[in-house]
């Protein structure tokens, strides 16, 4: 591990399932957990990027190469089948990171009922059904950590993707409801919200000098927040070090809000 990042003994051999792990923040999550010695399985529909993520982990000399399942998260049956396979392959799953999302820009005037449903299904629905598939064996074991990746976009009143922002605001509802339900049986549920974390996709599709300057004007930390830095908060909540944290939301936004 880089000397400036913590190592968590409790994450060695810990079993982790991540949605949307092929690129961006998801890829950073897969790599950072693997570097901790965790046994990681992840799903995504981008096979090329997923294999590249696995190769980076292998090249880094991780103890356990990540396991990949090709899944379109709009297909709940396929997602839950991958969850079941991961339970067998990893010997159980004790950490779930619901990460996959799509923040494509759209004008509210152009949104049809079908497109609205697609935004909800892409950015919210699969969170619940991954929990439904993996939580029972966590509850039976009496231990587990579920980390839902949200977005600060709705807090910041950001414009240009209402379907995404609406779906992401509901992630906090999943977190708090399920934290109350699962807490008595030792399973924690939290939300981690990124601010502006410039991934390859973000930079290619939407970056402008003016947009970055506006972000820097609002951030207390006057630099870009890196995907690996965001991942550190998730690692903490997955580790035993975060054992007293549940039903909370944690912002990693450089003090933007």
Regions inferred by a protein language model and the residue ranges of each:
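C-terminal substrate-recognition "lid" of short-chain dehydrogenase/reductases
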Residues: 131, 143, 223-252
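Substrate-binding pocket helix/loop in short-chain dehydrogenase/reductase
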Residues: 107-120, 215
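Residue(s) in the substrate-gating loop at a strand-loop-helix junction
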Residues: 151
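Alpha-helical segment proximal to the catalytic Tyr-Lys
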Residues: 136, 180-184, 243
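Short C-terminal tail/terminal secondary-structure segment
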Residues: 2-10, 156, 235, 246-257
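Conserved glycine-rich cofactor-binding loop
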Residues: 15, 22-23
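Active-site helix of classical SDR
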Residues: 131, 167, 175
């Amino acid at each position: 591990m880089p000397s400036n990042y913590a190592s968590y003994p409790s994450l060695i051999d810990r079993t982790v399932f991540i949605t949307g792990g092929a690129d961006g923040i998801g890829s950073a999550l897969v790599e950072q957990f693997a570097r901790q010695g965790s046994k990681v399985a992840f799903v995504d529909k981008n096979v090329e990027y997923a294999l590249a993520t696995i190769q980076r982990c292998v090249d880094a000399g991780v103890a356990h190469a990540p396991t990949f399942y090709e899944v379109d998260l709009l297909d709940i049956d396929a997602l839950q089948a991958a969850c079941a396979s991961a339970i067998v392959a990893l010997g159980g799953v004790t950490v779930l990171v619901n990460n996959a999302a799509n923040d494509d820009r759209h004008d509210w005037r152009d949104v049809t009922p079908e497109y609205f449903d697609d935004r909800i299904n892409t950015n919210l629905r699969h969170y619940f059904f991954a929990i439904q598939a993996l939580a029972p064996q966590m509850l039976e074991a009496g231990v587990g950590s579920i980390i839902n990746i949200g977005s600060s976009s709705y807090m910041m009143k950001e414009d240009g993707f209402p379907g995404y922002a609406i779906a992401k605001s509901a992630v906090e509802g999943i977190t708090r409801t399920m934290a109350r339900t699962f807490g008595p049986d030792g399973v924690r549920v939290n939300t981690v919200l990124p601010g502006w974390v410039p991934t390859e996709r973000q930079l290619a599709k939407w970056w402008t000098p003016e947009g970055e300057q506006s972000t820097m004007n609002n951030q207390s930390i006057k630099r870009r927040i890196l995907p690996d830095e965001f991942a550190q908060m998730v690692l903490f909540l997955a580790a035993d070090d975060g054992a007293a944290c549940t039903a909370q939301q944690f912002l990693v936004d450089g003090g933007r809000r």
